[in-house]
Structures are given as C-alpha cells and as structure tokens.
Amino acid sequence: MLKFAKFRRECVAEFRRVVWPARTQVHTAVKVVLVSTVVMALFLGLIDALFVALLSFFF
C-alpha cells in the first residue's frame, strides 16, 4: 500500500508540472487532424477506385 501511495503522490506532482495547451491550440490541432484525415481518406478512396477501374479493364 505504501508503494501505491507514493506512486499516487508522484503522479499528482507530475500532473501539476505539466504545461497544458490552451483551448484554442487544442481546437486548432483537432481541426488539422480532422481535415488531414478527410483529405487522406478521399485520396485513398480515389486511388482505390482507379485501381479497381484499371484492374476491371484488364480482367
């Protein structure tokens, strides 16, 4: 039990030292990730459709 208490105290101390990002930074990062994901999904979907069309042309 003593080890757990020490671990918990160290975790709390570490969380107090963390510099958390501002809300606007988080929103910007989320937007970048979402846009990047959608763009990549569209790109991969287009490549997949091209491969399907190309392979159906030969087979």
Swiss-Prot record:
Membrane topology recorded in Swiss-Prot or TrEMBL: Single-pass membrane protein
Matching PROSITE patterns: SECE_SEC61G
Residues spanning the membrane: 39-59
Transport in keyword set: yes
One function term, GO molecular function aspect: protein transmembrane transporter activity
Pfam families referenced in this protein's UniProt entry, alphabetically: SecE
Family of the protein in this entry: Belongs to the SecE/SEC61-gamma family.
Swiss-Prot/TrEMBL keywords: Cell inner membrane, Cell membrane, Membrane, Protein transport, Translocation, Transmembrane, Transmembrane helix, Transport
Localisation per UniProt entry: Cell inner membrane
GO biological process: intracellular protein transmembrane transport; protein secretion; protein targeting; protein transport by the Sec complex
Designated name of the protein: Protein translocase subunit SecE
Biological role: Essential subunit of the Sec protein translocation channel SecYEG. Clamps together the 2 halves of SecY. May contact the channel plug during translocation.
Organism encoding this protein: Treponema pallidum (strain Nichols)
